[in-house]
């Protein structure tokens, strides 16, 4: 476990005197994690899962960053260098929030089909620290990826990195001859791998992001949430506090498909969660050049035996590319208050309009249910809905 964690870190300037310490006792009869933020100590009892080591250190680091006036986010980061609608070459920084299984790593590492002077540059996959100006400090030189179903056709970059001699695999089927089978989930569906950032194309020597120009809240819903919506700061606060998606096999396989909410899509938060949401809203209000979006990587229109029109990786990566280029035409959705796209280059966006798949009454029932769920969740934080969402 220590070897795995070391493969995600930059060299330490003072390895003999660590700021944070985590102790595993896997033989403990109960599974309990105890964190002491004042001293930086975490006890991991009854588990030998590497993810608990990663979570223990990043949880503590986020807490200390918050104490110093910043924010720690469970988010990936990248830079898209694109020609905008005025044909000017610009660097656009993205950070992407997302629970396990929503596609955060896939979207972080994807090249978006950019060529020539246009390119995608990967910064971080999992945790960043943001200051009041939107500058994001990176934390790791390795990526902790979900391996279930990994294949060279759809996720070539990740597959190649995960099958090198330097990759470290956990809960993955490996045969005697060394062949790796990412489709075999007989051990568990939560297969994982640590890949080195240097093994991933489109990386450079920098893990920091100069500015988070675009903030993406990734969700995975299957009915009435559009492929992408654009948010104002109040709506962004709500999206952050909702941390909305559905459960996947990477989380709790017994609840896969059920609604799930986690503030900031971040299981690392210590202290009052509302403080983090309000601080993010303040940063957005003070930096009007930072824009927020919800990106749905699930499907739209699910009903009965129809699982919905799938929002493919190509759809999501194209949307992000056109957000960076500032070429999307937006209109306000009168029912929800946020903005929705009416034209996206490279996509027949009307094909993914949720309203096309339901009768007016069916849509009304689903919308009322979702609004009620959101209202009940936000009420826990004494946060009244400030929008129609």
Regions from the PLM with identified roles:
Residues 98-100, 123, 293:
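Short conserved micro-motifs on helix faces and helix-strand junctions that flank
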Residues 1-93, 118, 131-389:
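A noncatalytic interaction/capping subdomain that flanks phosphate/NTP-handling catalytic cores
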Residues 82-116:
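Glycine-rich phosphate-binding P-loop
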Residues 112-127, 134-135:
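Post-Walker A helix-loop "phosphate-sensing" segment adjacent to the P-loop in P-loop NTPases
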